[in-house]
Amino acid sequence: MSSKVHLGHTARKRFGQNFLTDDNVINRIVGAIVPDNDHVMVEIGPGLGALTEPVATAIDNLTVVELDRDLVERLQNHPVLKDKLTIHQGDALQFDFSQLVVPGKKLKVFGNLPYNISTPLMFHLFEFAEQIETMHFMLQKEVVLRLSASPGNKAYGRLTVMAQYFCQVVPVLEVPPHSFAPPPKVDSAVVRLLPYAEKPFPCKDVNVLRQLCTTAFNMRRKTLRNNLKQVLSDEEFEQLGIDPNLRPEQISVEQYVAMANMVCDKQA
């Protein structure tokens, strides 16, 4: 049987499907998630149910968002899970997660995310950060390194700044390719994202911060002065105590927020 066929389902490349099969890894992830009935538990991309089964067993109801119609049908007919699942068939990138919030209950979101959509999905989920208690995701190891990077690290970029603006980022464990069927060509890792109840560096307009980061990191090898000359002058950099000769990856989250807030003040 092809390595792309697991439990009778052929992994679809266009959906970025790699199914988790390592029981030890599964148990460690479920232990990190801490399933409970005090939150709305939400799984993105349940696939063949490697995480779905142990999580659903521990709680009364699990909400899942799955794009693949064949996998949705399997879950709808699952002898054990079907009565515990609330299934949304559709694209998580377009999904309004705020509709899942119940009064007095925040979301706990988790999933073995398709690697081809993981970065845009992170940005989408940050929009709902205030409604989310925790997020646990299996990602390409390189993405986890980007999420958790410090200034000066080559992995530090736009995703880093936005993730660390909204969340505390905690790498949980690394997962080798042989833990999946079919094995991906890259190493994987699990990350915990804890949205801040109160952000350490509040921004006056997060859209300005997002645009500023996009502009700053568009040409990583150039200086801030070069990349941000349309929005900040040398005098304004001096006011902020930021050296405009530095490169974008050398600037902290706090400094990016300070720059964005200055841009907001100028636009007011």
From Swiss-Prot:
Catalytic activities: adenosine(1518)/adenosine(1519) in 16S rRNA + 4 S-adenosyl-L-methionine = N(6)-dimethyladenosine(1518)/N(6)-dimethyladenosine(1519) in 16S rRNA + 4 S-adenosyl-L-homocysteine + 4 H(+)
Pfam families, alphabetized: RrnaAD
InterPro entries, per database record: KsgA/Erm, rRNA_Ade_diMease-like_C, rRNA_Ade_Mease_Trfase_CS, rRNA_Ade_methylase_Trfase_N, rRNA_adenine_dimethylase, SAM-dependent_MTases_sf
Enzyme class: transferase
Keywords: Cytoplasm, Methyltransferase, RNA-binding, rRNA processing, S-adenosyl-L-methionine, Transferase
EC number, UniProt record: 2.1.1.182
Main location: cytoplasm
GO cellular component, as recorded: cytosol
Family of this protein: Belongs to the class I-like SAM-binding methyltransferase superfamily. rRNA adenine N(6)-methyltransferase family. RsmA subfamily.
Described function: Specifically dimethylates two adjacent adenosines (A1518 and A1519) in the loop of a conserved hairpin near the 3'-end of 16S rRNA in the 30S particle. May play a critical role in biogenesis of 30S subunits.
The name this protein goes by in its record: Ribosomal RNA small subunit methyltransferase A
Organism: Shewanella sp. (strain ANA-3)
Gene name of the encoded protein: rsmA
